[in-house]
Amino acid sequence: MTYSIRTLTAVMALTLLPVSTPVAAQDISFNERLTKECYSQSDISEASPTRASCIGRSAKACMDTSGAEDHARNELCLQAEYDLWDQMSSGAYFMLEARLEEIDSNSHEGTPSQVILLENMHRAWINLRNTRCTFMQTRWRTGPDARSYEIACLTRETANQFFFLEDEMARGA
């Protein structure tokens, strides 16, 4: 029986993390299953959600129950969503790195190391992501939503990196 990388990654993500995460002492309700289930059903058919539409799904539901004007709780919801995508992205990175180590071990002498190139690319991406999201935060300077914009940016960029890493795995890296 064969499974796609997306299926394996989704199953891994669904089993590694708890279904409902109490994020902090403040009482918020963050259910990561909303994002994970959306993602596992994404891009299957034209009627299914797109991968990008799954970004923030759990945070939105969390904020809807926290109260729109409660900035501190909303930030906790957004932070929990970022943490979820960061964990999924890290898992995909390490899976890809392991696959590339195998490829490197079978490569001809003089061929650039795919693992080293992946590491260099990932460091550059982290720098770009952090700079881009700091820029987004500074656009709002001292407003109550400044930190929320930064976290939302980090989440979006990290989720997109997860998609990239997963696509590389699916291409047979």
Regions picked out by a protein language model, each given a short descriptive name:
Residues 1-11:
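Bacterial N-terminal signal peptides that target proteins for export
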Residues 24-173:
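N-terminal alpha-helical modules
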Residues 18-22:
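N-terminal signal peptide c-region/cleavage motif recognized by signal peptidases
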